[in-house]
Amino acid sequence: MKFVFVVHSEHYTARVMQLFDAAGIDYYTRWDQAQGKGHGTEPHLGRGSYSSTNSVMMIAFQDEAPLEALIRAIMAANAEIKRAADRIRLFQLPLERMV
């Protein structure tokens, strides 16, 4: 089992939801207006010069197939996003148990 966080600019929320649909994923938890700064990116603080914010999607996968489909879809979407700092990020961790 795997645990995934998908982090993206809120500008790309509709696109990320399309990627989820295409991968057959209709289960997630989403946090909007997340603030922070990634490696090599500008801050997303929701105010001032850094008025943009991120969304964070959390997904628990029991099966690898939809996760692999999502990874492929994100890689393809990122190839179309010109600025590397704007790309959709996916962080994968092992998941020991779901109750």
Predicted regions and their residues:
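Positively charged, small/polar-rich N-terminal and surface patches that mediate targeting and assembly
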Residues: 1-99
